[in-house]
Amino acid sequence: METVVNRGFRREGVNETCPCDTLIDAARNVWRSNNVAGFTKGEAEEATRLMAEDYIVSTVVEETRQRNGGRGKSICFVTGVPGAGKTLVGLNVSVALQNVGASMLSGNGPLVSVLTAALKRDLNKYKKQLKTATNEISVESIIRGAYGYKKEIFEKRLDYHVGEGTVSLKDNAELSSQHVLIFDEAQRAWNKAKMIRPGQSGKKYWQEEKFPFSEPGLLLWDMNQCDWGVFVCLVGGGQEIHTGEAGICEWLRTLEETPELRDWHVYMSDEFKGEVYNSKDGSGKTIEEYRTIFEAQNRLTISKDLHLTACQRSNRTEKVSDFVEQLLNCNADACRTLYNNEIKGKYKIYLTRDVEKAKAKLRERKAETLNKGFVDGQNDEEVRIGMLMSSKAARMRPLGYEIKKESQYKDKVPSWFLDSDDTVVSSDFLEIALNEFFVQGLELDLAAVMWDADLRYNEQNNEWDYFDFNDRYWSAVDKGEQELKRSYMKNAYRVLLTRARIGMVIVVPYGSQVDKTRAPELYDGTYNYLKSLGLEDI
């Protein structure tokens, strides 16, 4: 039983000097060529991504279709450093397996809207030149919003018995045509509490305490109804950024505790372990404990091909994600060593206390890059710049930047990422800063990250202090009961500091002597810490 796939991504003679495209450009290239030509970066970066894609298509899917008399089910976890290309793996596999009903799901609304808008703009622009096969593939079949897919499950397949807390398959149910589902940012899937929270759906049964499923439970229940299926989880370590995000262990807990899923096979790499991937809420078992259970049940396969080891986003060095990790862990010595020995000559990180200097530096670097005619040796018509800040950065308003809520700004996000620099809503205009919820999974070429008093370096204790703003003053987010919230706040900066491909500016404001909510001492410790790492002050 052979799965016929588009083998376009298995190329020979990769150009070792050509870097990766941005995710948006990569998606466009998939669309135009109906394969992944043009995604090259070379050397280890290209190799690890291609091995992951090939392993999923050639090994995971084929073994699953042979298992249990053609009714096998599998789940596959793809891990990697921030910017390693996990989302790109998902897009490539989705396109390659369109004939068996593959689709990529994402609960990241901005990412779905930006990629969908980019592909639709491309279709309108190049429709006559695009391959016939491309025109036959709808944008929506490649990538879908997770919310819409869950709604389809309720409307067409799942019959929930109100008051009983049980489910069954609807009479004359329309089973999913998707045999391969790729779930982006699987660590952000909803827990049960968020699934039943009022306002998440117009369906009354979603708001009932007895509803039995978390988001992983619902999606795996649905695929279990098909004759065969592969569920691919793309996992970003330490990137849960919102309440109600279950963490990756919820997928493993569901597989272990649900009797109907006991025959599912599990694929993962040996790197899928440790604090960065384990859930931070303290509930349930660790990944290591689940691995032991699955091994004893003879339903676990470990493959090195499922971990992406090199960062493609920072295409001048894969060490930037390591640097950010050490920075957030307050390991100054390790940061200095990394920056001076591995990063400084390839990827510039500037530090300033003046937002206007940051904007000027972004424009200067953009002009320099365009004048050279390439980004890391790749011809590029566009260098994307933009302003970023955390969703807790409440006191950037005096500098001209307000927190954007997704409900109020989501329709503008595609324009921010895609419009030209003569449009005021474009990122290049540098008037609007987006936060971690809008940019996770996407990237810029050059970014300015504005660092507010929500995350402050404590010089005395060599640790971070966390604060929320309540319109009058900053209140501490304490250890203990609020530890999960603290991890979300740190993860927000991890996301922001790993968005830029060729360089960034970190802005720590001076503060104000006449505004206690922006007092200089709220910022000085953070600035001093970052300066001690050897970043170039401008």
Task: Report residues per predicted region.
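N-terminal pre-P-loop "Q-motif" helix
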Residues: 39-74
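Conserved lysine of the Walker
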Residues: 86
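Signature of the SF2 helicase/ATPase Hel1-core->accessory helical subdomain module
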Residues: 182-290, 459
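Accessory nucleic-acid engagement/destabilization modules that flank
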Residues: 1-19
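C-terminal accessory regions
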Residues: 227-230, 432-538
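Hydrophobic anchor at the beta1->P-loop junction of P-loop NTPases
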Residues: 78
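Conserved helicase/translocase motor-coupling segment
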Residues: 90, 242-245, 274-453, 457-459
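Conserved RecA-like ASCE ATPase "motif II neighborhood" in helicase/translocase motors
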Residues: 133-223, 431-435
